[in-house]
Amino acid sequence: MFEKPVVKTFQYGNHTVTLETGVIARQATAAVMVTMDDTAVFVSVVGKKEAVAGQDFFPLTVNYQERTYAAGKIPGGFFKREGRPSEGETLTARLIDRPIRPLFPDAFKNEVQVIATVVSVNPDVQPDIPTMIGTSAALAISGIPFNGPIGAARVGHIDGQLVLNPSQTELNASRLDLVVAGTESAVLMVESEADNLTEEEMLAAVVFGHDQQQVVINAINEFKAEVATPAWDWVAPEENTALKTKIAELAEAKLVEAYQITEKMARYDRIHEIAAEVNEALLAQDPEADTKEIHTIFHDLEKTVVRRSIIAGNPRIDGREKDMVRALDVRTGVLPRTHGSALFTRGETQALVTATLGTQRDAQIIDELTGERKDHFLLHYNFPPYCVGETGFVGSPKRREIGHGKLAKRGIAAVMPSVDEFPYTVRVVSEITESNGSSSMASVCGTSLALMDAGVPIKASVAGIAMGLVKEGDDFVVLSDILGDEDHLGDMDFKVAGTSTGVTALQMDIKIEGITKEIMQIALNQAQGARKHILSVMDEALAGARDDISEFAPRIHTMKISAEKIKDVIGKGGAVIRALTEETGTTIEIEDDGTIKIAATEGAAAKEAIRRIEEITAEVEVGRIYTGKVARLADFGAFVTVLPGKDGLVHISQIAEKRVEKVSDYLTEGQEVQVKVLEIDRQGRVRLSMKEAVEKPAEEAAAEAPAAKEE
């Protein structure tokens, strides 16, 4: 029934990788099953042969989905099936999309969809690298115009050594988690989180990963040759040189002037005016002219004008030199009732960032294929439409917002205290209130400030900077602190976050081939200077964490009890702990080893909760006097509660010095009495005495008198 499948197996570091096609999903344009040491991902690619008429963008969609059966699990929840993509799935989809998107021809507008499904998972092999390899292989054998293949590698830094594709266990001990993807000749994408590594160490890791992934590229080329799918007969549409010349005559000089307007919204208004004038003039000449084609050529002209000016060494769009950072304004404690807040403004980019402290119960529970884990540091990034002066839909976070939030979190993670050092769950929210480039790096700066304002003892201040590149032939200019237009019209988006001593996160997206090690080195060095400048301004506003947390934040008090006593504090069906939390207004968390964490905004409430827990867990001591309450009477004596849940018997002979005929003549239920513990027998029964308790104070006074004299 099946033709013989094509299988390619190769060694990639410590892992064996297998590519297979020809058995599954034969109606797709291309489909590949990639296996890497028991982690298997099925990748399909479907491309439409025809583009939608008049479409002026490339509709590439990447869907990444993890099936729970891959780990031998059934989904939790009511519906028992996978739902919308998780944050992790969204981030992996972006990781796949970023290096492949620049490799399709500029004029190619046919719809392409990549669907990657994780069907088997080895807990020690993360699915993202095999997924990227499988996507590259599927596109390579699809016949779709694609200037690949690409390779992908994860790089760790363990004991001073770079490690290729470290296992999950190794990654836990690594100072670096870096993913790099690229073609045979160029790096296209880097995503990383680091523990204060130097610029030289980061660059070495990028180069190492790119060198190692050549094995993958060679294997995919051999796989492609064996499959031998005919290439599509797609030809790029001819350039309308006549229209291009007309638009240049009408708009070029005006655009040069417009791009000297330094204020973003005023510049945009002028560019829109010029575009409208061009449209009007061309439609007057030819009412049948294609307005979408006019728009595309006009946009290309904008790009040419800006790039030519930068390469010529002229001041940038907003008047800065290539290595200048925009004006900074840093404010902390801007919101009165939040636990920590900061307003970070860099030029026309602004982030209002808040930090909120919660208990460990507030931690995010993340159910992954490899198991459940808790995240005690959350960072959420919001990009509302008003921040760029637009109207738009406001709803659940988009892929871009999730990706930018994750990048900012990576930048801060290395300086966060451990849960043992700071037993709080911390949630940071970055509201982008103005945007003109590098809002994710503004979020890093604002997060660092908001955390310190909240009293979180971070190890060092962190700042972030976005670098850009314009390259024409052998000429290139590296730009510091890029604007939105420079990002859009340039060749590289290179974001670096770090402290004064090292890099904590690096993200790089390159739109062209030919980015050399030299260019990356210049960008990293230029970024270091900019980062240190920003840190110096931040330190003037707030140089370290505040001495105390906000008065509105919960204070966590820790105590330890015997593990055997946990059941007493919880009570039957949770009755005791529920009563404790409701009556004291605290949040109480109990760990299996007997550690109890009590969170309260008021100290008195925490003290009361501690006192009551101590009462519940206290042991009755022989010889000690207690103030107890009569629980019930019997003919032979009275049962007295000396501690919560702990009763003892006062025998009728121990009630008073004289003979007692009837217990009720001396005691009533609910009466408070002083009792001394005489004995606890093998069965745990407590024998009490009232008459011994009466004699004790006189004995104590006699014993303490000499001690007072000695003082």
UniProtKB/Swiss-Prot annotation:
Its cofactor is Mg(2+). Residues 623-691 form the S1 motif domain. Residues 554-613 form the KH domain. HAMAP family: PNPase. It is an enzyme of class 2 (transferase). It catalyses: RNA(n+1) + phosphate = RNA(n) + a ribonucleoside 5'-diphosphate. The gene is pnp. It comes from Vibrio parahaemolyticus serotype O3:K6 (strain RIMD 2210633). Involved in mRNA degradation. Catalyzes the phosphorolysis of single-stranded polyribonucleotides processively in the 3'- to 5'-direction. One of its GO terms (cellular component) is cytosol. Mg(2+) binds at residues 487, 493. Its EC number is 2.7.7.8. GO terms for biological process: mRNA catabolic process; RNA processing. It is found in: Cytoplasm. Component of the RNA degradosome, which is a multiprotein complex involved in RNA processing and mRNA degradation. The keyword Cell inner membrane does not apply. The keyword Methyltransferase does not apply. This is Polyribonucleotide nucleotidyltransferase. Belongs to the polyribonucleotide nucleotidyltransferase family.
